């Protein structure tokens, strides 16, 4: 048996030094001090000392986890990663996670549902990217599917359409075909299915864009026509046409514009 001969406050708030038989033995959190009723003069056997140290390890790990959770919601995997960074053993991590789960500090399904809800509003994402994000965060497939069930087809179309309108502005000088391809790709990158992207593109890019298409192809054709002005006529026409093909313009429109350029050149 060893006797507590001194209890002193550490510089770190909420921590105490325990001296046994006039020698420093270990430090404990205030919660552990209270839980075990540690006081000067109390005698401790080796088994009790081991139990006190184990409880203090849990208290320190719990403090790390709660501080991490105080900033935002996190998954079990993320909390464990944070404790691992602080060199907390896996067995202690499991005990801490069990306490946190019981006290509802962590809940992967709640995290997933909150994440889905947030990604409808802030930095919007589609279901595919959200699913990857949640998997990376350690959420299981069942919880992911449950959370994503709150992301309706109508909401996906509404959010994707807003993103598509922004992309349409970015690609306004592109050919209709190129514009559609780039918008679909942008939406796919954001996590929306190609089915959703196609529906949205058909809404955003309408037949009313014909005038814009004509303006764009004329602008591009004139640039290419000037660029190849030193070529022989046949090569000038060929290279200008090829440039327009690669930008996604259709053959009929290209021929019309090239004809206009040829007429202008003859004049």
Swiss-Prot record:
Q: Where in the cell is it found?
A: Cytoplasm
Q: Which UniProt keywords apply?
A: Cytoplasm
Q: Which InterPro entries match?
A: RecX_HTH_1st, RecX_HTH_2nd, RecX_HTH_3rd, Regulatory_RecX, WH-like_DNA-bd_sf
- Family of this protein: Belongs to the RecX family.
Q: Which Gene3D superfamilies match?
A: Winged helix-like DNA-binding domain superfamily/Winged helix DNA-binding domain
Name of the featured protein: Regulatory protein RecX
Question: Which PANTHER family has this protein been placed in?
Answer: REGULATORY PROTEIN RECX FAMILY PROTEIN
HAMAP family, per the entry = RecX
Q: Which gene encodes it?
A: recX
Q: Which GO terms describe its cellular component?
A: cytoplasm
- Please give the function described in this protein's UniProt entry: Modulates RecA activity.
Please name one Pfam family that this protein belongs to.
RecX_HTH3
GO biological process annotations for this chain's record? Answer: regulation of DNA repair
Origin species: Leuconostoc mesenteroides subsp. mesenteroides (strain ATCC 8293 / DSM 20343 / BCRC 11652 / CCM 1803 / JCM 6124 / NCDO 523 / NBRC 100496 / NCIMB 8023 / NCTC 12954 / NRRL B-1118 / 37Y)
- Is tRNA processing tagged as a keyword? no
Q: Which NCBIfam families match?
A: PRK14135.1 (NF010733)
């Amino acid at each position: 048996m060893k006797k507590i001969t001194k209890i002193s406050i550490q510089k770190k708030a909420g921590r105490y030094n325990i001296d046994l038989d006039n020698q420093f033995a270990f430090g404990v959190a205030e919660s552990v001090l209270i839980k075990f009723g540690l006081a000067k003069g109390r005698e401790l056997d080796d088994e009790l000392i081991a139990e006190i140290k184990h409880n203090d390890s849990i208290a320190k790990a719990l403090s790390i986890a709660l501080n991490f959770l105080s900033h935002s919601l996190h998954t079990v995997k993320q909390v464990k990663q944070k404790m691992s960074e602080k060199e907390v053993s896996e067995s202690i991590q499991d005990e801490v996670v069990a306490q946190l789960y019981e006290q509802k500090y962590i809940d992967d399904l709640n995290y997933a549902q909150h994440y889905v809800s947030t990604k409808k509003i802030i930095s919007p994402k589609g279901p595919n990217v959200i699913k990857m994000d949640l998997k990376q965060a350690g959420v299981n497939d069942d919880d992911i599917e449950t959370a994503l069930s709150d992301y309706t087809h109508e909401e996906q179309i509404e959010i994707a359409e807003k993103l598509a309108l922004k992309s349409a502005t970015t690609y306004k000088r592109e050919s209709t075909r190129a514009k559609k391809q780039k918008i679909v790709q942008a939406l796919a990158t954001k996590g929306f299915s190609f089915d959703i992207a196609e529906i949205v593109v058909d809404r955003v890019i309408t037949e009313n864009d014909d005038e814009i298409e004509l303006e764009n192809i004329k602008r591009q054709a004139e640039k290419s026509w000037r660029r190849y002005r030193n070529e022989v006529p046949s090569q000038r026409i060929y290279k200008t046409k090829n440039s327009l093909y690669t930008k996604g313009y259709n053959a009929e429109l290209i021929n019309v514009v090239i004809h206009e350029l040829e007429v202008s050149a003859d004049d």
